[in-house]
Regions:
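Alpha-helical transmembrane segments of multipass membrane proteins
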Residues: 31, 64-68, 122, 183-187, ...
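C-terminal ends of transmembrane helices
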Residues: 34-47, 94-104, 159-163, 229
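Juxtamembrane helix-loop-helix connectors linking adjacent transmembrane helices
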Residues: 86, 105-109, 127-221, 239
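N-terminal signal-anchor module of multipass membrane proteins
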Residues: 1-38
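Membrane-interface helix/loop boundary segments of multi-pass membrane proteins
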Residues: 168-172, 227-249
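Membrane-interfacial, low-structure loops and terminal tails that flank and connect transmembrane helices
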Residues: 40-58, 161-172, 238
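Small-residue-rich segments of transmembrane alpha-helices in multi-pass membrane proteins
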Residues: 59-62, 113-124, 172-185, 240-245
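Alpha-helical transmembrane segments in multi-pass membrane proteins
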Residues: 17-27, 56-155
Length: 249
């Protein structure tokens, strides 16, 4: 995956310099950690290594924070606000989830605040508009947020599952292709044209780029929404509903 996106990024960048090389290396680190946490064995290792106490649990998030500050400094976007905001949206959810780790695994005010902090900071533009690689890449803070929230819920909170795994079987691929085709044909394209989100153009990307573009849309648009709404909110709400049903006479 990293090789594919590196080749695609190099094809889009007009000039290769040290900043581009460093940003692609950082991109590789973030993608590697993001994909790695889809493996249950990796998650179990992280729990054993960093889940013993609060200080050790915050070490990986501290690494993410240092990478964030370093990358912003390279882009010359480092301000007082940009030092404080990443500190809040990386560590506040982690602290809330640490104190919630022994409670039943259903939605409550701590879980909800942890999710909303990460979501609103990005949606409301409270984080810098930094891309990786610069100018023509993906949202840098989206990668940081995904790594942070997945780590916080799976390792610090100890959530049993959020449906995030990297071992799709034949049935997964069949349903994924079927529902993606139905969504594009009957919802995405018609609604996109009606709302002017999609428009006609005579400028086309080379055909070889389209598979990479679709993969990028899946990873950086579809995956975050699935993790947030289905992986976290849906599963935590399901836990709450099961609890309420078990308490009915």
């Amino acid at each position: 995956m990293l090789i594919v996106f590196t080749a695609f990024a190099f094809s889009e960048v007009e000039q290769i310099n040290l900043l581009v090389i460093v940003s692609l290396s950082l991109f590789g680190v973030l993608i590697f950690s993001l994909v790695g946490m889809a493996d249950p064995e990796v998650v179990n290792y992280l729990r054993q290594r960093f889940g013993k106490n609060l200080l050790s649990a915050l070490v990986p998030l501290t690494v993410l924070y240092i990478l964030t500050i370093g990358y912003l400094a390279m882009l010359d976007q480092l301000t007082t606000g940009q030092i404080i905001f990443p500190l809040i949206y990386l560590f506040l959810p982690a602290l809330l989830l640490w104190w919630d780790r022994h409670n039943p695994q259903h939605i409550n005010w701590r879980n909800l605040i942890a999710i909303l902090v990460v979501w609103f900071f990005i949606e409301l533009g409270l984080v810098p508009a930094a891309s990786i690689p610069p100018d023509k890449g993906v949202s840098f803070f989206l990668l940081i947020a995904l790594n942070g929230i997945i780590y916080s819920f799976l390792v610090i909170r100890g959530l049993d599952s959020m449906g995030y795994r990297l071992r799709p079987n034949l049935e997964d691929w069949k349903y994924a292709c079927l529902y993606l085709g139905l969504f594009i044909a009957f919802f995405a394209v018609p609604i996109g044209f009606l709302t002017s989100f999609i428009g006609q153009t005579t400028d086309w990307h080379p055909l070889w780029q389209f598979p990479f573009i679709l993969l990028g849309i899946f990873l950086f648009t579809g995956l975050p929404e699935e993790i947030l709404f289905r992986g976290l909110i849906h599963n935590l709400l399901a836990g709450r509903l099961k609890k309420n049903q078990s308490e009915l006479p």
